[in-house]
């Protein structure tokens, strides 16, 4: 199918598809471990239920379904050549605790609609319904990843890491807050931990990975634009920091004798804000903060806090960490405190593949600039309608999948930019535009592929 032919589709099909997506987001939101809120974590009974429902919707859209060895739900629309590689489209169905209903979920449901819109059924004279197949040289596969958020075991991207073949067997011993190990949870879910490597895909099996996701910030809303191409996913480092001072009597210890660990840590948290807020695309967050022994009448002798540091570029991020470290030396030296840290996470930035950025851009242009897909007239006009490109400070499944194939992403406007919160939102109209842009992007990639 060509982009032009897709453009000839009645625009109401995209709205109908978006209505189905929104209704299904509502339906999935009711599958939760916490009534009145949305919480759906890895390998839970809720995970099993949403996989079954997603599989049903995939089959109804003509896809061949299976759940892989890591609990990811997959749906395949094969190419005419069964050996042909596939373009993977998807996102995740797990949530954080007390989540919104769109983060991840909307991307999976949009992928199902896109495959439904693009598929071809060959004429069959026998009167039997011919199986649906991909109209491109490559198959289309919808992936609903089982764990992106890491809400249960503290380790994110478990589902997509298994697909990428970067699974670490040490993860089996990770425990959830109830002391259940990942291994025990997998067995209870019906998975065989010894077979997790079967979920891994070879690079040669894939053409690439495309994901639609709500923006988890306010940038598109502020610009008054519905869609953006994602250029890269943030690099991130996470640290647990400990400040050591001396616990002493709150009444009997004069200020000049105090070595108050909490005050040193507080100054450090403020320094993180001061340093990061003056840097372009560097975000530092202190999200956990504790004082010990934690009594009202004792000067805190120890403080512990976390630091989440993200950046568009690894080098810039590392330079800022060096600057923060020097500042901490200074603060703690002045206050006669000691500090040390343990790095608990380090992921490089993931740059979206130029070709996939191009096709997502073409998809957006075809969607927002009527006629541009058909006659290419915009090509000679300096592209005044160049789609917005954003870097994603939030993590996504593409960070893991990037280990085996090219990654591209499409962002949709999120009013107020609220995410990981029940107020998370996206409009029906923007989802309709997003479905069309994603379908156009796939069609553009199909045309590119044929050419090469
Ligand atoms: Zn997400």
Description of each model-found segment:
Residues 89, 98-148, 237-243, 249-275, ...:
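Alpha-helical metal-binding/catalytic segments enriched in His/Glu/Asp
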Residues 135, 147-148, 152-314:
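Midchain, well-structured core segments that form catalytic/ion-binding scaffolds
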Residues 231-233, 249, 253-278, 326, ...:
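His/Asp/Glu-rich mid-to-C-terminal helical/loop segments that flank catalytic regions of hydrolases
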Residues 39-43, 285-294, 306-313, 338-358:
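A short beta-alpha structural unit
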Residues 2-44, 171, 343:
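N-terminal capping segment at the start of a domain
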Residues 33-78:
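A non-catalytic alpha/beta surface segment that caps or lines the substrate-entry region
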Residues 15-18, 29-30, 181-231, 269-274, ...:
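Active-site-adjacent substrate-binding region
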Residues 21-24, 29, 87-91, 376, ...:
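Zn-dependent metallopeptidase/amidohydrolase metal-coordination segment
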């Amino acid at each position: 199918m060509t982009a032009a032919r897709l453009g000839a589709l009645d625009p109401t099909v995209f709205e109908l598809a978006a209505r189905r997506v929104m209704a299904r987001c509502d339906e999935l939101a009711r599958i939760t471990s916490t009534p009145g809120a949305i919480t759906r974590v890895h390998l839970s009974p809720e995970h099993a239920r949403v996989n079954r429902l997603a599989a049903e919707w995939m089959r109804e859209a003509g896809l061949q379904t299976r759940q892989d060895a890591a609990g990811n739900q997959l749906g395949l629309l094969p190419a005419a050549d069964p050996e042909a590689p596939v373009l993977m489209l998807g996102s995740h169905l797990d949530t954080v605790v007390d989540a919104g209903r769109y983060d991840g979920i909307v991307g999976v449901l949009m992928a199902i609609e896109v495959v439904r819109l693009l598929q071809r059924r060959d004429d069959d004279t026998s009167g039997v319904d011919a199986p649906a197949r991909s109209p491109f040289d490559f198959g289309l596969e919808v992936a609903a990843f089982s764990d992106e958020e890491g809400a249960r075991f503290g380790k994110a991207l478990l589902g997509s890491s298994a697909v990428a073949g970067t699974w670490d067997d040490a993860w089996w011993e990770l425990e959830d807050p109830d002391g259940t190990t990942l291994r025990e949870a997998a067995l209870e879910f019906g998975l065989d931990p010894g077979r997790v490597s079967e979920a891994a895909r070879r690079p040669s099996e894939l053409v690439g990975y495309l994901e639609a996701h709500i923006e988890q910030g306010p940038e598109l809303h502020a610009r008054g634009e519905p869609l953006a191409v994602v250029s890269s996913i943030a690099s991130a480092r996470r640290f647990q920091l400990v400040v050591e001072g001396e616990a002493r009597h709150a009444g009997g210890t004069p200020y000049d004798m105090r070595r108050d660990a909490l005050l040193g840590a507080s100054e450090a948290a403020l320094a993180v804000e001061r340093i990061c807020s003056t840097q372009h695309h560097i975000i530092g967050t202190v999200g956990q903060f504790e004082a010990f022994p934690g009594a009202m009448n004792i000067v805190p002798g120890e403080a512990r806090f976390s630091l989440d540091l993200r950046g568009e570029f690894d080098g810039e991020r590392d330079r800022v960490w060096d600057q923060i470290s020097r500042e901490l030396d200074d603060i703690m030296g002045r206050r006669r405190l000691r500090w040390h840290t343990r790095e608990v996470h380090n992921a490089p930035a993931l740059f979206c593949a130029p070709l996939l950025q191009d096709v997502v851009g073409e998809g957006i242009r075809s969607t927002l600039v009527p006629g541009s897909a058909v006659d290419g007239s915009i090509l000679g006009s300096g592209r005044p309608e160049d789609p917005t490109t954003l870097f994603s400070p939030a993590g996504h499944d593409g960070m893991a999948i990037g280990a085996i194939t090219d990654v591209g992403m499409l962002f949709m406007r999120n009013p107020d930019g609220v995410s990981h919160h029940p107020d998370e939102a996206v409009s029906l109209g923007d989802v309709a535009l997003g479905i069309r842009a994603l379908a156009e992007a796939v069609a553009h990639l199909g045309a590119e592929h044929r050419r090469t």
